């Protein structure tokens, strides 16, 4: 039987205020999120760190073009990357936390090895992404007309924060589709040739 493990530490918080207080956010941190998530839940807290809104760099699935645009505004070294959002946010943040994040094409071509630069804290805001506990980042490589996944232990988040407040306000359409996504992940685990009694 193969080992079943979850790498990131998982913590649950009652609300966003408790999460922020426990994390001790400083000016060295960088938050990557969506404006529609940040404004109602965090804006009034006047956090001391820079905040980048993913939708300002492109829409839809994460792409190499979106990441390059994002990288231009996230160039300085950061103490921690805090990713608050769905799969797109989490996949982009995994790359932002790398030392060699400016080598996206080489990383996805297998010509460069990912190296972690700083801790990554993943805060999922949908029910089914699963990306918060994996070592995979998927990007659409626009120049090559393909979509690829990069899997390496350097991409594991260091901590996952579960904050129910962030899922409560999810529009019904997103709640329904992300719940189906979670159900599909469960079925995949059960039907996998590598399934175990635990999975």
Annotate each PLM feature.
Residues 84, 90-103:
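DPxDG-like acidic metal-binding loop motif
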Residues 1-80:
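ATP/NTP phosphate-donor binding region
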Residues 39-40, 88-94, 130-133:
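Short glycine/serine/threonine-rich phosphate/pyrophosphate-binding segments
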Residues 32-33, 84, 123:
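Short hydrophobic segments within beta-strands
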Residues 70, 92-97, 186-187:
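Buried hydrophobic packing segments
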Residues 44-47, 96-99, 134-138:
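Short, glycine/charged-enriched secondary-structure capping and boundary segments
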Residues 101-197:
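A glycine/threonine-rich phosphate-anchoring loop and its flanking beta-alpha core
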């Amino acid at each position: 039987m193969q080992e079943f493990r979850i790498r990131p530490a998982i913590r649950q918080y009652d609300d966003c205020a408790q999460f922020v207080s426990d994390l001790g956010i400083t000016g060295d941190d960088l938050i990557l999120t969506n404006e529609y998530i940040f404004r109602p839940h965090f804006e009034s807290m006047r956090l001391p760190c820079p905040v980048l809104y993913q939708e300002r760099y492109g829409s839809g699935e994460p792409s190499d073009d979106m990441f390059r645009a994002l990288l231009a505004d996230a160039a300085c070294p950061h103490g921690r990357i805090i990713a608050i959002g769905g799969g797109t946010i989490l996949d982009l943040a995994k790359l932002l936390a790398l030392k060699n994040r400016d080598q996206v094409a080489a990383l996805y071509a297998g010509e460069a090895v990912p190296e972690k630069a700083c801790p990554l804290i993943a805060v999922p805001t949908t029910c089914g992404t699963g990306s918060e506990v994996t070592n995979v980042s998927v990007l659409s490589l626009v120049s090559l007309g393909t979509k690829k996944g990069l899997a390496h232990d350097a991409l594991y988040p260091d901590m996952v924060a579960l904050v129910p407040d962030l899922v409560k306000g999810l529009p019904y359409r997103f709640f329904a589709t992300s719940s189906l996504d979670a159900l599909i992940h469960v079925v995949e685990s059960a039907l996998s040739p590598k399934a175990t009694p635990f999975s």
